[in-house]
């Protein structure tokens, strides 16, 4: 699992602010910038917490992010106000028992145990099948669980879809059932 650093959240906010009226309505949790580092193969992972090189990797990522933030001249931020608390939490997280969930889950399935996976969001927010660019950074469809958990698709026995009686959306983007008249108010 990848870690969302304080600078990821700052990059998310800076990018959103710079887009002005064209912004897509990010949740500002740093998820998009974290996925950018994941696909760029320079992100921080939970396993890095116990690697002995966490501080070095964090500082390299921090330096990269500060360089990117410098491009947003109108964006003001205070990294130090959240960084020490985040580093403390990261240290505490690194002291927990960390396991390889891919092996753990597959061993459980091999032993005949039932595994329940829960996902969030819906197909219209899926990075590949959703209303791009107004999507999240991950696969939100049932197949995304296989990728995220390290479980082969042939191991899934049953998928149960749950939906709300009414649609909602965070941010902007297409909303086919939105009522723009008095009823929608």
Across the structure, where does each feature detected by a protein language model lie?
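Non-transmembrane, aqueous-exposed alpha-helical and coiled segments at domain scale
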Residues: 1-185
């Amino acid at each position: 699992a990848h870690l969302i650093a304080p600078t990821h959240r700052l990059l998310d906010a800076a990018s959103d602010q710079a887009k002005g009226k064209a912004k897509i309505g990010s949740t500002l949790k740093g998820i998009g910038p974290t996925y950018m580092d994941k696909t760029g193969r320079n992100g921080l992972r939970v396993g890095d917490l116990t690697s002995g090189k966490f501080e070095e990797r964090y500082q390299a990522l921090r330096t990269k992010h500060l360089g990117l933030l410098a491009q947003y001249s109108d964006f003001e931020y205070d990294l130090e106000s959240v960084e020490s608390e985040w580093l403390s939490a990261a240290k505490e997280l690194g002291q927990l028992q960390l396991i390889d969930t891919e092996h753990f889950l597959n061993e459980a399935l091999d032993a005949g145990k039932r595994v329940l996976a829960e996902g969030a969001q819906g197909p219209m927010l899926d990075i590949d099948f959703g209303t791009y660019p107004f999507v999240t950074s991950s696969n939100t469809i049932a197949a995304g669980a296989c990728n995220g958990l390290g479980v082969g698709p042939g191991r899934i026995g049953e998928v149960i879809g749950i939906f709300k009686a009414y649609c909602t959306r965070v941010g902007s983007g297409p909303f086919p059932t939105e009522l723009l008249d008095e009823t929608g108010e």
